[in-house]
């Protein structure tokens, strides 16, 4: 499992002109799932993200987690994170999980994030989405389970 995590001042996701998910501040997650991922990977990533100390304390050091600052999470499914661009000019997405499997694991992942005590908004799995955010910092990390 691969997640691109962005610390966000605000974020939203729109499908067909309608906002389907929105947070005031917290973390925006682009979530990629490969066919080898399991529920164990999803739980590991959910716990890691909830507890990563990437929000600043009073002295400007990254000492607080999204839980500590009472932030929220906007989770967006993103199969293109497993695009392989090493050969040719068109990405190969063979490492991305099949949609049925990926959607089930993506839903499980979001529930695991909620179990950590976080409010989670989502996009619409498999839809063409417009994602808007104000990246705070910018702080952008890649979190992987393997």
UniProtKB/Swiss-Prot annotation:
EC number(s) stated in the UniProt entry for this protein: 3.1.1.96
Cellular component aspect of the GO annotation: cytoplasm
InterPro entries per the UniProt record, alphabetical: Daa-tRNA_deacyls_DTD (IPR003732), DTD-like_sf (IPR023509)
Catalysed reaction equations from the record: glycyl-tRNA(Ala) + H2O = tRNA(Ala) + glycine + H(+); a D-aminoacyl-tRNA + H2O = a tRNA + a D-alpha-amino acid + H(+)
Motif placement: Gly-cisPro motif, important for rejection of L-amino acids: 137-138
Any matching Pfam family: Tyr_Deacylase
Keyword Cell membrane among UniProt keywords: no
Protein name: D-aminoacyl-tRNA deacylase
Source organism of the structure: Bacillus cereus (strain AH187)
């Amino acid at each position: 499992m691969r997640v691109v995590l962005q610390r966000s001042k605000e974020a939203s996701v729109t499908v067909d002109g309608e906002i389907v998910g929105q947070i005031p501040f917290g973390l925006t997650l682009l979530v990629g799932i490969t066919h080898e991922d399991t529920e164990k990977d999803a739980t590991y990533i959910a716990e890691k993200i909830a507890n990563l100390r990437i929000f600043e304390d009073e002295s400007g050091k990254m000492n607080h987690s999204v839980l500590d600052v009472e932030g929220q999470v906007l989770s967006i499914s993103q199969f293109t994170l497993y695009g392989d661009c090493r050969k040719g000019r068109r990405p190969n997405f063979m490492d991305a999980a099949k949609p049925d499997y990926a959607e089930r694991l993506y839903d499980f992942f979001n529930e695991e994030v909620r179990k950590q005590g976080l409010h989670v908004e989502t996009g619409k799995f498999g839809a063409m989405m417009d994602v808007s955010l104000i990246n705070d910092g910018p702080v952008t990390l890649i979190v992987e389970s393997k």
